[in-house]
From Swiss-Prot:
HAMAP family: Arg_repressor. This is Arginine regulator. GO terms for cellular component: cytoplasm. Coiled coil: none annotated. Keywords: Activator, Arginine metabolism, Cytoplasm, DNA-binding, Transcription, Transcription regulation. It comes from Streptococcus gordonii (strain Challis / ATCC 35105 / BCRC 15272 / CH1 / DL1 / V288). The lineage of its organism: Bacteria, Bacillati, Bacillota, Bacilli, Lactobacillales.
Length: 156
């Protein structure tokens, strides 16, 4: 087992044994077990392990999120980071503009995700038209797809 795997195993074990409230607390627990990590390394580890903070009786602590993203969600995020040009709702549709040749890939991924808001996708070379039941469904679909867009994509 390499260094990263053993550190991940230790983090999982610490999270399951004890309610860890902060990243600093987790870092101190790791140090108490002989593992020194920087804050940035710990952040990457926490993301890789899919740790999320939950609140119970006004007390927050980390748990392992057992609902891991699907391979289709990962693929959508990857494509959106590399090939998304524009995304916007238009009445009961969402228009997705992509790099040339990739719209059909987006359509296939969206179809595989089976999002409840999407009735159908119609794709050309660089545009994927996402058809929804009604205007509110299109806004809901747009909001869901925005979650997969790269940070700051909509602040351009």
């Amino acid at each position: 087992m390499n260094k990263i795997e053993s550190r991940h195993r230790l983090i999982r074990s610490l999270i399951m044994e004890k309610k860890v409230h902060t990243q600093q607390e987790l870092q101190e627990l790791l140090e108490a077990n002989g593992v020194i990590v920087t804050q940035s390394t710990l952040s990457r580890d926490m993301k890789a392990l899919n740790l999320v903070k939950v609140t119970e009786n006004n007390i927050s602590y980390y748990v392992i999120n057992s609902i891991a993203p699907s391979r289709w969600e990962k693929r959508l995020r990857f494509y959106m980071e590399d090939a998304l040009i524009m995304l916007r709702p238009v009445q009961n549709q969402v228009v997705m503009k992509t790099l040339p040749g990739l719209a059909q890939s987006f359509g296939a991924i969206l179809d595989a995700l089976e999002l409840p808001q999407i009735v159908a996708t119609v794709c050309g070379d660089d545009v994927c038209l996402i058809i929804c039941e009604d205007n509110p469904s299109a806004i809901e679909c747009f909001d869901k797809l925005k979650e997969f867009a790269p940070p700051f994509f909509f602040s351009k």
